[in-house]
Every structure is written in C-alpha cells, then in structure tokens.
Amino acid sequence: MSNNMAKIAEARKTVEQLKLEVNIDRMKVSQAAAELLAFCETHAKDDPLVTPVPAAENPFRDKRLFCTLL
C-alpha cells in the first residue's frame, strides 16, 4: 500500500509541474538563435573580447618599469 501511495504522490507532483509548465511562452530554436546572433552583432563594438581595448586605455597593460641593479 505504501508503494501505491508513493506512486500517487509522485504522479500528483508531476501533474503540478506540468500545470506550471503549460503557461511558459516558448519559441522555436531557430528564432532564438537568430535573435541571439542579432544581439551579438549589435553589441560586438562594445565587447572588449571582440574589439580589443586600445593599449593607452587598458588598465591591465604592462607597466614597463625598468630597474637597474648595481
């Protein structure tokens, strides 16, 4: 009997999850990929990995300090 009750509880949990998922807006993968590609192309100019930061503005550039040891 306990096994039967566990199956019923699991089925109820599954039904509740499906009720939540039925209201989710979905889109085709091709549409999502096209939107993502358009977003990336639009924002590419602001991405430092695509268009590098000029050396004069780069806070992580080498400082090139020269030390002489006597």
UniProtKB/Swiss-Prot annotation:
Q: Which PROSITE patterns does the annotation name? A: G_PROTEIN_GAMMA
Lipidation, kind S-geranylgeranyl cysteine: residue numbers? Answer: C67
Record's subunit section: G proteins are composed of 3 units, alpha, beta and gamma.
Q: In which tissues is it expressed?
A: Detected in the olfactory epithelium, the vomeronasal epithelium and, to a lesser extent, the olfactory bulb.
Q: Name one GO cellular component term.
A: heterotrimeric G-protein complex
Q: Which residues carry this modification: Cysteine methyl ester?
A: C67
Q: What does this protein do?
A: Guanine nucleotide-binding proteins (G proteins) are involved as a modulator or transducer in various transmembrane signaling systems. The beta and gamma chains are required for the GTPase activity, for replacement of GDP by GTP, and for G protein-effector interaction. This subunit may have a very specific role in the development and turnover of olfactory and vomeronasal neurons.
In Swiss-Prot or TrEMBL terms, this protein is called Guanine nucleotide-binding protein G(I)/G(S)/G(O) subunit gamma-8
The gene from which this protein is expressed is: Gng8
Q: How does it sit in the membrane?
A: Lipid-anchor
Matches recorded under Pfam families: G-gamma
Cellular location of this protein?
Cell membrane
| Coarse class of the protein's main subcellular location | membrane
Any one GO molecular function term: G-protein beta-subunit binding
Among the record's GO biological process terms, what is one?
A: cellular response to pheromone
Propeptide boundaries = 68-70
Q: Which SMART domains does this chain map to?
A: G_gamma, GGL
> So what family is this one in?
Belongs to the G protein gamma family.
Q: Sorted alphabetically, which keywords does the UniProt record give?
A: Cell membrane, Lipoprotein, Membrane, Methylation, Prenylation, Transducer
